[in-house]
Amino acid sequence: MARGPARTSLGPGSQQLPLLSLLLLLLLRDADGSHTAAARPPPPAAADGLAGDKNPQRSPGDVAAAQSPGAQDMVAVHMLRLYEKYSRRGARPGGGNTVRSFRARLEVVNQKAVYFFNLTSMQDSEMILTATFHFYSEPQWPPAREVPCKQRAKNASCRLLPPGPPARQHLLFRSLSQNTATQGLLRGAMALPPPPRGLWQAKDISLIVKAARRDGELLLSAQLDSGEKDTGVPRLGPHAPYILIYANDLAISEPNSVAVTLQRYDPFQAGDPEPGAAPNSSADPRVRRATQATGPLQNNELPGLDERPAQAPHAQHYHKHELWPNPLRALKPRPGRKDRRKKGQDVFMASSQVLDFDEKTMQKARKKQWDEPRVCSRRYLKVDFADIGWNEWIISPKSFDAYYCSGACEFPMPKMVRPSNHATIQSIVRAVGIVPGIPEPCCVPDKMSSLGVLFLDENRNVVLKVYPNMSVETCACR
């Protein structure tokens, strides 16, 4: 009978003690984990606030950082996030149009790790806006001190005193005139407060980079100096530093700028004949626009049913009335159904040069061309960089919707083609016919949008450029 009360009296205590012990163990484990667990590096900090982006949907840059083999390559991950940001928001990177990244080359100088950056790939037309140095910093704890063992105690044990405060680091920048591991000219020094844990940091080095470029010394070295010599052999790992330079390329709006920066070789090498050139023609690497066969894709006109390839060199030049039969001309009133039944075939047969198709085929062709607008308008065109041989160095996008403008600008021009005053007068003069040889206005792009391209330069550095006038938004007669 005595066992029953004892069991009931100990019951509540036996339930509370395990709970308290479990809670204490969890607290101790969390406290130890805050000091011993390996810190996971956050996304690289940048002046544009990418690290603070809390989009719940994972972007391709985040997926690449977590899954791809190059997940440790923070340069590629950071540049991909910049590309996604400016492609999505349509903004200009740092107020400019160019972001260049530069990887570090590790050298050991006086038993200390020194990181070298080759900035010579910057173009003269690129005006530097800002430059940031991205590096991974960890607290440098001094070695712990050992406490002498107490011999008087029954269970004598030795312990280590907790280490003192972490050492203060200095970030040193030097510029070099030659690509050698020398001291160089000191360009700047920054005192870094000890970080609470291992994390990525970014420092503004715009003045340093601008001064080095002004003096023609585009080889920079960076060193994290804590006063102690590095133990072991330094290696470039996943935490290698890098430099980002935001610039405004003044030549990006010049004609043919996209080919100047993205084309790695001439498609028509010197000595190689151009496609379609005569066997005994001279090997001039320049593209001869005047001698190229003129077709509907070159003169912004849609092909007609009776268009056939030229049979002789003198047959390359056509007049509009020779290529377009009367029923297919734009802005002509469509005849009634009864008139088409009676006169449609006779009129078409009298003006067309194609006589080898049956009536059913011709009706299908006529219906297809009536469905497609003949007036000046935007047409769909998708450009794949693999088709022009640029996919080897272009990272993203692989393709884009470029569109193009094509169609007729005949008098009277509707409002939808947004003709200029000059185009309106030109179409009237052409329609009157007093001045011979006046062509009709051309269907050209009116409004265009830019395109961000992420690619590798000749030094295998990742570059982001926002090219203007890459995709057609609207077309007009000019």
UniProtKB/Swiss-Prot annotation:
Residues 1-33 form the signal peptide. Disulfide bonds join C376-C443, C405-C475, C409-C477. The keyword Ubl conjugation does not apply. Transmembrane segments: none annotated. SUPFAM superfamilies: Cystine-knot cytokines. Residues 291-301 have a biased composition (Polar residues). One of its GO terms (biological process) is negative regulation of ossification. InterPro entries: BMP3/BMP3B, Cystine-knot_cytokine, TGF-b_C, TGF-beta-rel, TGFb_CS. Residues 331-343 have a biased composition (Basic residues). It comes from the Eukaryota. Gene3D superfamilies: Cystine-knot cytokines. It holds the Pfam family TGF_beta. It is found in: Secreted. Residues 34-368 form a propeptide. GO terms for cellular component: extracellular space. Keywords: Cleavage on pair of basic residues, Cytokine, Disulfide bond, Glycoprotein, Growth factor, Osteogenesis, Secreted, Signal. The keyword Nucleus does not apply. Growth factor involved in osteogenesis and adipogenesis. Plays an inhibitory role in the process of osteoblast differentiation via SMAD2/3 pathway. Plays an inhibitory role in the process of adipogenesis. Homodimer or heterodimer. Can form a non-covalent complex of the mature region and the pro-region. Belongs to the TGF-beta family. This is Growth/differentiation factor 10. It comes from Bos taurus (Bovine).
